[in-house]
Amino acid sequence: MHGNQGEDPTEPHRSGPYTHTAVSHEPRIQQLSDDFARLGLRPFHTPLGVMLNEKDSHASRCIRCETCDGFPCLVGAKSDAQVCAVDPALQHSNVTLKTNAYVERLETSSSGREIDKVIIKNNGIREEVSGNIVVSSCGAINTAALLLRSANDKHSTGLGNSSGIVGRHYMGHVNSVLMALSKCPNPTIFQKSLSVNDFYFGSEEWTYPMGHISFVGKLDGETLKGGAPALTPGWTLDLMAQHSLDFWLTSEDLPDPNNRVTLDSNGGIVLSYKPNNEEGHKRLIAKLKELMRQQTKCRIHGHECHEGLFARNLYVGQRIPLAGVAHQVGTVRFGNDPQTSALDANCKAHDVDNLYVVDGSFFCSSGAVNPALTIMANALRVGEHLISRMK
């Protein structure tokens, strides 16, 4: 994990520094970081899980390519679950990975206190699997759906759902992508290295939380084509991408019990959601635009380069729709009270002695940053608990 301890003004206590120093900024991103700092902000290097060795490029698995964000890594250089956990685990003879397998339901013993069988369809063939411990890591939507599908006479509203909260409190963040177009091209390849949290808890004008500013991976014309009008010329999209800084803005999505996962009469997943915290997000976007108008004057054009390709401030952006579920959390929340939570502090179901949920479902609130590192850290924590339990 790359990062610099103490840069993020919202950083909580850490037991020690990051294992690797932060990924460096490319020149255009460094210039923007310097501009933000000049304005009194505290920009910081985005913590990144990549296998990068900047001191010795020949020894580096990561090559700082433009497809790091949003694409599988073809050289296995992301510190993701596959590279760090699944692939090493498969080196052991007692680990089996079943592909094309769909877990239909979890069946309990007659007492309802433990899971007896995991019912799987594997390439159309029904199978039963059993184990002393069952861990669901399907993601907040599919874990909730699995528990609801697994209702029985002991768990009439869904497995582990005596509290009635399984599927509720779905959160996926209030997210937007904003392209800031400028006269000067942006030659950056590895763009996702800078973040700003100065408005995480609000601003002088707005005393409520606003959120987090960072970057997406560098956009290109082909990526933009998916959201552009059908008749948009390809060269226009290419030109826009070559002259853009591509921001990702995240605001906290509040835990509304009516934002929830349910099943329809055929067992299909229904995601019901009403957006919230929209005013804070709008103000975050406006604040970023205000900051961009105060950039250092361009040495080439003699004025704010960000006046845009068409001699005016120009932004292109969109809110991420409900289908953008990458940050899904909250549907099987943990807590000490079985009446208001489905999991205990170790992410074990209150109602089922051998069921654990270790994905984003356990979150009680979403925060306003990518939940991936928190999910990973919690998985390691629960793993230590399981080792102790199985001794």
How should these model regions be labeled?
Residues 56-61, 109-116:
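A short, glycine/Asx- and small/polar-enriched loop/turn
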Residues 78, 132, 159, 277, ...:
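Alpha-helix N-cap/helix-initiation motif
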Residues 17-23, 72-75, 270-279, 366, ...:
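Active-site rim elements
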Residues 365-386:
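A conserved FAD-binding loop/helix module that cradles the flavin
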Residues 39, 163-286, 325-330, 350, ...:
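FAD cofactor-binding and catalytic pocket of flavoenzymes
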Residues 1-103, 312, 319-324, 333:
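Conserved redox-cofactor binding core of oxidoreductases
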Residues 46, 64-65, 104-107, 280-365, ...:
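A glycine-rich dinucleotide-binding beta-alpha-beta segment and adjacent secondary-structure elements
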Residues 92, 101, 105-109, 116-190, ...:
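Glycine-rich loop(s) and the adjacent beta-strand/alpha-helix scaffold that form part
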